Amino acid sequence: MAALHPPKHETFDVPAGTNTDPKGFVRQVETYRTADFGLYMDRSADHKEFSRLESWLLPDFGLRVSIFHYRAGHERDQHLYLDIGEFTGPDNDGRWHAEDWYLDLIDRPGRGLELEDVDELLDAHAAWLLPVDRAEAAVHIATRTMVGAASHGNDVQAWLAAEGAELTWSPR
């Protein structure tokens, strides 16, 4: 179980070409791309387990869909990692913003989406760190996403494409 914490916030500063993570670290972004349905980001990562991070912020879905490019020896069987929360942008300065609402969905090939961190959501709500409307919205987003993926052969990208959000990724 993770330590109790308020919702994590992240900033995607498209004009500056930077991404400020929840800990306040500012990182250069190699690629930002906007679509009618969201914002794509591709950046290198100075992390011991992964070297690159690709993400789509999908405001209408309440999702951030990511691919972590893991380093040798740290590979995982997951394909996509989905954060649930509030994703907005662009603001008047061209920045996008993310507020993570604790719940995550893991997409592993050949299996249904796996819901994680329910305990974090409940603990945060009990500690008044996440209001009831956002906690409830997180559960609805997770449910809609899991049902949508299941209705498309456990393929979350196929479901998103059918809903008008066709995700494209770096060919790396």
In which residue ranges do the predicted regions lie?
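Charge-rich, low-complexity N-terminal segments
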Residues: M1-L53
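Cysteine/selenocysteine-centered motifs that mediate thiol-based redox chemistry or coordinate metal-sulfur cofactors
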Residues: I141-R172
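Short small/polar-residue motifs
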Residues: P22-E30, G62-F68, Y102-L103
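Conserved, surface-exposed functional patches that form binding/active-site neighborhoods
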Residues: D77-L129
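Compact, glycine/acidic-enriched structural inserts
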Residues: M1-P7, L113-E114, L121-D123, W128-T143
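Low-complexity, flexible helical/coil segments
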Residues: H74-Q78, D119-L121, V139-T143, A150-N154
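The feature represents the first ordered module of a protein
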Residues: L39-D93
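Well-ordered beta-strand positions
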Residues: T31-T34, L57, I106-D107
